[in-house]
Structure formats: C-alpha cells, structure tokens
Amino acid sequence: MRVFSSIDELRHTLDALRRQGRTVGLVPTMGYLHAGHMELVSRARAENDIVVVSIFVNPLQFGPAEDLSKYPRDLERDAAMLRQAGVNFLFSPGVEDMYSRPMLTVVDVPDLGRELEGAVRPGHFAGVATVVCKLFNIVQPQTAYFGAKDYQQVVIIKRMVDDLALPVRLISVPTVRDSDGLALSSRNVYLSEAERRAAVIVPQTLDEAERLVADGLTDPVELEARLTAFLSREPLAKPEVVAVRDAATLQPVTSIADPVVVALFVRVGSTRLLDNRVVGSNRFVGNNRVAGGQSLPGKGVTR
C-alpha cells in the first residue's frame, strides 16, 4: 500500500492507472477506523481494481465548540488495518495540503443540510459537501462508498452529485453494529462504561419505531412523541433530534404510508450518537434504489 499526502502525486499516479483502464473506488473517512469502515473497504475491494481510502479530519465540518481537537486519531494503526485489507492507496493529507489558503468556495445543499443533524450543527453539512466534492475532484473515482449510519450525509452527497453532474456512483453500505445493536462509530470511544451501557437505548428506540409502525401507527407526529418518551427512560440520554421523514427526500411527511426514515441524534453524556432506520410498507424507494443504486438501509449488520 502506498501512502500519499500530496494531491498532485496522487493524481499523477491515478491518472496513469486510469489510462490503463483500471477502475477506482474511494472510501472517504476521518480515520480511527473500525469494522464499519472495513466493511466499506471490503465492498470497494470487491468492485474495483484500485481502492483509495482517504483519512482526513476535516476542520470545515466541525463547529467552534465541537470535538475537532480531541477527535481520535491513530494513523499508524489505521494504515496497518488498511494494508492488511488490501487497500492500494491511502491518502492522508494535512490541513495545509487540503486547504493551503482559506477556502472562499463552499459547496452547500441548504434545504437538506440545515435540517435534522444540520439544525443542531450549523455549517456541518456544508463542510462535509465541500470536502467530499474536493476529494471527488482529486481522486476522480468511478464509485464512492459511504456508511448508511450517516443517512442524511448520503442523501446530501447524492443530491450534490446529481446537481453538479459529478461522474461518480454512490454506494450506501448497511450500518455495522455491535452485538447489542449500537452502531459502530469512532466517537464511541468517548463513552464511559456507564454511558456505553446507556447508549443501547438508541438502537432500542429504532426497534420500538419499527414495532409501532408494524402495529399500524401512521401519524408521524405521534411516532416522534412516543419515541421521545421511549428515549426518556434512559436518564443519561438527551435526545436532540427525533424525526420521521420521507426516506428518499428527507422532507416532512403527514402520514406513514411510504417508507420513512426515523432519524435519531442523541447525546449520551458529552457524546452525540447518530442512528437511523427506514420503516414503512417496505424498505425501497423509487426503483428499489437510493444513494447511487443501493437499497435503503434497514437494521444493518451485527459485528
């Protein structure tokens, strides 16, 4: 596995491989890799000649009071995991490589990026869309892989790709979960033992959503209220977002007829946990596809 920090060197190498007809898959990450990331890598390895994994803790997507400075980092460990998984290239630029001068250009999808998680993290999704667009321009992959846990992010990036006619196909890979159902996340390392035990209320709330809808509940406002009450059983859990939205567009719905996504953004201690589940009559939208050809995510995969 070759490691790059220079944009120009990576571009030069990939250009030569593309001229040979090689296909390129990209897995964008912020590092501190876990089994969920490696599931993305495995999918990319199966579908592409060349796999590029990027590790970049992007300052544009962190607010002034967020965890940029303490976000977990271990590049040596991550590189060893990627090397063992058969990744071809690791792109790990510094901030000075990605943003050699202050960014005056921002990619924003405001109608989608200021809802749900974006409502409590102003500017977050503009930072995400900007760095992902830049990574797409640098790597020029045919396919890029994202975890379904970040459901809103996938919908926003898909809209960005469609609106800007970017020649990349997006694949949303089902969430990987621990044995008790908690979605794997690099931020789980922040949780104390008591908080980790409490965090299981998040996937349990999604189970409750699925049960209520299966039992015939069709009022999204009532579903949100009942899920908020369910979360309140755990005193360490403080819900910031409990929302029921159209699974394809993230728009509010008046009735749970078509598939909806239940989106949760819950603070446990000082750690924000993000999770979601698609519920409804089935798990598909349109031509059974969303986010570049993938089925909508359901419960995910247990590790």
Curated annotation (Swiss-Prot):
Family classification: Belongs to the pantothenate synthetase family.
Record-given protein name: Pantothenate synthetase
Domain of life the protein comes from: Bacteria
Leading EC class: ligase
UniProt-annotated binding residues for ATP: 30-37, 147-150, 176, 184-187
GO cellular component: cytosol
GO biological process, one term: pantothenate biosynthetic process
Gene Ontology molecular-function annotations: ATP binding; pantoate-beta-alanine ligase activity
Gene (name only): panC
